[in-house]
Amino acid sequence: VSSKSRGHVQSLSRRIGGVVAVVACAVLAGAGATMPDGRPTPTGLDVPRWVSLKSSHVRARQGPGLDYRILWEYRAAGLPVQVIAETREWRKICDPEHGVAWIKRSVASGRRGAFNGSDAEVAVHAARNAQSPVRARFSPRSVVALDECKDGWCRVRAQKIKGWLPEGSVFGTQAMAQCDARRGAGEAGRRAG
């Protein structure tokens, strides 16, 4: 082998090594975010995760594409939904009634919300304990912005009121998947597990 071809092989080898290193870094960078079945997510974000609806007119579809039939329409901007699977442009979500559907990526916001799906008011406290003063009452079937959850309590806000409510008292705060990602869109709602 001539020195000229040896140099070409070494140069090619270095380029391939560089490409392998770049690909390995890209794979490792997204290695922490996976779908429930273990596949990496297209966004690199965790699944399940919480998002909220940007608009008061969001179409829920049977599958990830405009060719799939519309199952229903959400009419509540800020409604929290849990992403349980995703493609690059579509999110498979679990809603407060444990319905599963696909929505377009562009109608989901990374801002979190909380939904009181019960028929009772939920007390919003001044601090993270039940003995602290009640600042407001979170009405049934309503949505508030959610800032953070910590030590079993979540800080919420609506207009000029801020306070804390128990983490398990509303939809949008749970760490575990609320619907089974394997369930087909439009099937009767039921919790995961």
Where are these regions (language model features)?
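Bacterial N-terminal signal peptides that target proteins for export
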Residues: 3-20
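SH3-family beta-barrel domains
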Residues: 34-59, 73-77, 84-87, 94-99, ...
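Bacterial N-terminal signal peptides
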Residues: 18-29
